[in-house]
UniProtKB/Swiss-Prot annotation:
This is Profilin-3. It comes from the Eukaryota. SUPFAM superfamilies: Profilin (actin-binding protein). The keyword Phosphoprotein applies. Belongs to the profilin family. The variability of the residues taking part of IgE-binding epitopes might be responsible of the difference in cross-reactivity among olive pollen cultivars, and between distantly related pollen species, leading to a variable range of allergy reactions among atopic patients. The keyword Disulfide bond applies. The modification Phosphothreonine is found at T111. Transmembrane segments: none annotated. Keywords: Actin-binding, Allergen, Cytoplasm, Cytoskeleton, Disulfide bond, Phosphoprotein. SMART domains: PROF. Occurs in many kinds of cells as a complex with monomeric actin in a 1:1 ratio. It is found in: Cytoplasm, Cytoskeleton.
């Protein structure tokens, strides 16, 4: 299965008649492996900050996490594995695998829990596959 197929079939899928606003699979260096059409362009310093938070959990908490210049308040995640952010009625979930970052961005009516489930399920699968 191609990376693009993972994005559309596993991340942009319908969940209780809702779906993510956008999603992507990125390399740890921020290189886009696959993305949905509306996915925002990360800036290099944003990827650096995200990777640092995976290495040093809590790094982004004081300043927030920025994605394409938009600020997200960092909320409870899983240290070293998952970063979650909230912005208004929406948010973001980022799951780190051995080689990739699985990213999902949502807005209401999708819930944070639905976004977490979709992103983390694919991330866990990729980890099992050695990715």
């Amino acid at each position: 299965m191609s990376w693009q197929a993972y994005v559309y079939e596993h991340l942009m899928c319908e969940i209780e008649s809702h779906h993510l606003s956008s999603a992507a699979i990125l390399g740890h260096d921020g290189t886009v492996w696959a993305q949905s059409t509306a996915f925002p362009q990360f800036k290099p310093e944003e990827i650096t900050g995200i990777m640092k938070d995976f290495d040093e959990p809590g790094h982004l908490a004081p300043t927030g996490m920025f994605v394409a210049g938009a600020k997200y308040m960092v909320i409870q995640g899983e240290p070293g594995a998952v970063i979650r952010g909230k912005k208004g009625a929406g948010g973001i979930t980022i799951k780190k695998t051995g080689q990739a970052l699985v990213v999902g961005i949502y807005d209401e009516p999708m819930t944070p829990g639905q976004c977490n489930m979709v992103v983390e399920r694919l991330g866990d699968y990729l980890l099992e596959q050695g990715q």
